[in-house]
Regions:
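Soluble catalytic regions of large protease machineries
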Residues: 2-203
Length: 203
């Protein structure tokens, strides 16, 4: 980890520690909320903050999934643009598990809201409507071949099985994205995802 990344990590950890008792919407950095409000995309700052939180969980899902399957990426960001609410940049090395990363944004948003689709019929109906999403839907379906062929349902359930146990890691990365007004490099995301501040070291 470069010295600049070490400083960035220390700053983020200090800010997260200071804001530990606050909910996600309360810790959104003004930079991210203003981006979404000033462009006229949302009627007020409250709505802009809510959208920022959803974007942070979405991108954190992609990032943590990439770490879980052994892929690499350059950085994660929730910078608001014309076509995307954020992005995990330069993902590589996912192999035949790339579809897990593609599904992870939507799965993370459902983990945030505790709205997982438990019935297969409900999930199958939702998958039939899933289009666009910054290219996630297209990439997910394109990557299924090596493991699941065209069976989207089985691939999605497999992705859930890998990601649901990682909810707390996703939450930590999401909160880091919310409090920091710039992109997070790979090494910083790796450290934040791995470090649980609730775990105390032994004597």
């Amino acid at each position: 980890m470069r010295p600049s990344e070490q400083r960035q990590l220390a700053s983020i950890r200090a800010e997260l520690s200071r804001l530990i008792r606050y909910d996600d919407e309360s810790i959104v950095h003004d930079t991210w909320a203003r981006q979404r409000y000033d462009c006229g995309c949302f009627p007020g700052l409250m709505a802009a903050r809510g959208a920022t939180v959803a974007a942070a969980w979405h991108e954190a899902g992609h990032a943590v999934a990439a770490l879980d399957v052994g892929a690499h990426f350059s950085s994660a960001s929730i910078h608001h643009g014309c076509t995307a609410e954020g992005r995990v940049h330069g993902i590589s090395g996912a192999g035949d598990l790339a579809f897990v990363i593609d599904a992870a944004g939507q799965i993370a948003e459902r983990l945030m809201r505790w709205t997982m689709l438990e019935r297969d019929d409900d999930l199958r109906a939702w998958l039939a409507t899933w289009r666009g999403d910054g290219g996630d839907a297209r990439r997910f379906r394109r990557a299924l071949g090596p493991r699941f062929g065209g069976d989207e349902l089985r691939a999605w359930r497999y992705s859930e099985q890998r990601l649901v146990p990682l909810r707390l890691r996703i939450a930590r990365v999401a909160r880091a994205l919310l409090v920091h007004p710039r992109y997070l490099p790979y090494n910083v995301v790796l450290e934040i995802a791995a470090h649980d501040p609730a775990q105390r070291r032994g004597p």
